[in-house]
Amino acid sequence: MSSQEYTTFIDIPVTRAQVEHCSYSFWSSLYPKYVPKSIVLKSLPKKFIQYLEQDGIKLPQEENSRSVYTEEIIRNEDNDYSDWEDDEDTATEFVQEVEPLIDFPELHQKLKDALNELGAVAPKLNWSAPRDATWILPNNTMKCNEVNELYLLLNASNYIMHDLQRAFKGCVDGDDIKGLKFDLVLRQWCDMNPALEFRVFVKNAHIVGATQRDLNYYDYLDELSDTFKDLIDEIVHDVVLPKFPDKSFVLDVYIPRPFNKIFIVDINPFARKTDSLLFSWNEIAAIAPPKNDVEDYELRLVTRHNTGRFASKEHSENHVPQDLVEASLNPEAIRELTQKWKELLSQQAKEESSDSESET
């Protein structure tokens, strides 16, 4: 019988406190010089949480505020669903929906004020950003220019639902979220080159590995790896470790051109729930601490074109929201959202056509 090697599963315990330390409002206050300008709305009202958790997406229609997402649909032969409506009306049960203008008007106004102050923003809750729901906006990013885009993005995200319902899943000291306060973070929008985002694994105050976050091939990254590692070493040992209460964590950073500064994007728990990207968690957990405090970790990069990666867009498994999969959305809401989506795409196409004509 031939010998066969087996890989031992290495347990990586994580506590509730470690997860809480990775909440944006906690760690961002420790490193204000290394994060983008943002507004944090703390202790969100229960009605807002219910609004995010309810079936369907109810957008506010304000009299003095125009939004393309709430403009009345003009019926024509392409969107006349009268044959559907009679049957559906009899089968639909009345459910009291949470509405922004009625149930949390103060928060709604704070969101509008934040947009006026910061311009476009990218939202996130305590831990997660709705990166899986960018399909719902015409620009296919998390860039929100108006309050209805915030509502659409947050409502359509499974990552946001994870924060609301399973924030402490897998914690050794319990997963109960009772009494947990939620925050909404609005970060001023900036265009980031995904090739220059990196994930850094820190175990027992030592860097044990780093990887690019975007899993596509960029031919210029390898020759810059020493520059990237110098900046990563500096921010981990001189900035983060002296103030962060835990010695094991996963740090997301951004290093923009001309590669003389580094910014903190996020801090995540050192746990299997955090995506290990180009590493495996067993691989990370098995890395021994450096000898003589001299760290010689690997910055792992994609070294060749991965055509399969291009064929499978990131977060594509989430590009149909759970509400639609379960057919639990209000049918009328689905029809209206579909029509508005068509109108937005048509408007975007006209604007692009106008821009191209003006350039010629």
Swiss-Prot record:
Protein localization: Cytoplasm
GO biological process, one term: eukaryotic translation initiation factor 2 complex assembly
Residues the record lists as binding ATP: K124, W127, A129, R131, R187, W189, C190, E197, R199, R213, D252, D266, N268
Pfam families: D123
GO molecular function: ATP binding; magnesium ion binding; protein folding chaperone
Induction: Expressed during exponential growth and repressed in stationary phase (at protein level). Levels not affected by the presence of mating pheromone (at protein level).
GO CC annotations, alphabetized: cytoplasm
Binding site for Mg(2+): D266, N268
Keywords: ATP-binding, Chaperone, Cytoplasm, Magnesium, Metal-binding, Nucleotide-binding
Classification via InterPro entries: CDC123
Family: Belongs to the CDC123 family.
Function: ATP-dependent protein-folding chaperone for the eIF2 complex. Binds to the gamma subunit of the eIF2 complex which allows the subunit to assemble with the alpha and beta subunits.
Subunit architecture: Interacts with the eIF2 complex gamma subunit GCD11 (via C-terminus); the interaction is direct and appears to be specific for an unassembled form of GCD11. Interacts with the eIF2 complex alpha subunit SUI2; the interaction is direct. Interacts with the eIF2 beta complex subunit SUI3. Interacts with DMA1. Interacts with DMA2.
Protein's name according to its UniProt entry: Translation initiation factor eIF2 assembly protein
Encoding gene, per UniProt annotation: CDC123
